[in-house]
Amino acid sequence: MWNALTSSSNFVLESLETFAESTGVAGLIANMGWGSLIMICVAFFLLYLAIKHKFEPLLLLTIAFGMLLTNLPGANLYHTELFAGGHVHWDIFVAQAGLLDYLYLGVKLGIYPCLIFVGVGAMTDFGPLIANPKSFLLGAAAQLGIFLTFIGAYALGFSPAEAGSIGIIGGADGPTSIYLTAILAPELLGPIAVAAYSYMALVPVIQPPIMRMLTTEKERKIKMRQLRPVSKTEKILFPLIITVIIALLLPSAAPLVGCLMLGNLMKECGVVDRLSKTVQNELMNIVVIFLGLTVGATATAEAFLNPRTLFILVLGVIAFAMGTAGGVLLAKVMNFFSKGDNKINPLIGSAGVSAVPMAARVSQPEGQKADPSNFLLMHAMGPNVAGVVGSAVAAGILLSFLG
């Protein structure tokens, strides 16, 4: 009987020891996981920003939670080795993959960003852009930050593919940044996604000082003439024409631009309201959850806690600032060739970055500070939606050279 009790006690102790060794706490102690602890703290900080201060909460909350899950020892939800070298290792995928590995395929294969662009297109009104085609130039000028930062990042020692992924932050377009980075430099996906969405949330903080610095009070008081009405036929033809032109000139931009214009055509044609509402709401919400979780899962301690992340954050805000400045400065140049009520208020140039509609909403109060009777919101929406197309085209250009 004594032997039976001893045997039972040993079994219980061994079971408890096995259980203790399988816990995440044991993993932290055994591996001295200070990196994981720091990343868990970063995840909680981002959750705080999303919940308390509403910084891009729809995506920042899910990104932060994905970051939390991937850094919990022993969870085995995401495995970086399955995607090492920028490729999916299908030979070992099924045997080792966790939940987030399967969901990450939507990022790796470029599915989620394109589906989000369908939803964005269905929520976008291109009327102000059609009514004032000059807005296309302001949207293009705001992509200046992308290419200047690409050059700067390359000069600092990043590879061309990494530099391109960092530069795209300047477009202030989260899905485009994720789409391009997943192809060119997937190891940087976590830091770049966090930077892109953080700076989008900080548009009202970053842009106004630059706008005021580059404009005079007289320029900020410029009143623009009312936009002409845009017919339904124009709104239907616009996505079709843009899709054909961009797909022929820059095929690498066709997935993003094509999905954007598909969503917009659903909205404007008026015959598929059910589909339009679905992509604006249900589809968009589901994809945002999957995208945020899987992008956050890539932010492991090894990928995030290094000096390169600091460079990415600094270069990202520089790219965003230069994009803002590019739009404002081109508007000032265009005014040299404009007369009377054809002049452009340079404040709307800053809306050329594709943070829709935050950038356009920043132009409005800045204009009213100079003249309370000035209303710039609809004028600013033209460059703003042009910036969405512009950032997708910029990504296509980088892909065609670096992909």
PLM regions and their residue ranges:
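Transmembrane helical segments that form the transport core of multi-pass membrane transport proteins
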Residues: 243-331
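Hydrophobic transmembrane alpha-helices of secondary-active transporters
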Residues: 46, 104-130, 263-266, 284-306
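Alpha-helical membrane segments and immediately flanking helix-loop junctions
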Residues: 108-109, 117-123, 138-148, 152, ...
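Entry/N-cap segments of selected transmembrane alpha helices
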Residues: 33, 129-150, 302-328, 380-384
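Alpha-helical transmembrane segments
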Residues: 187-205, 313-323, 346-351
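Membrane-embedded hairpin module used as a gating/binding unit in multi-pass transport
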Residues: 198-271
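Interfacial helix-loop-helix linkers and transmembrane-helix boundary segments
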Residues: 51-60, 78-79, 102-103, 123-138, ...
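N-terminal alpha-helical transmembrane segments of multi-pass membrane transport
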Residues: 1-84
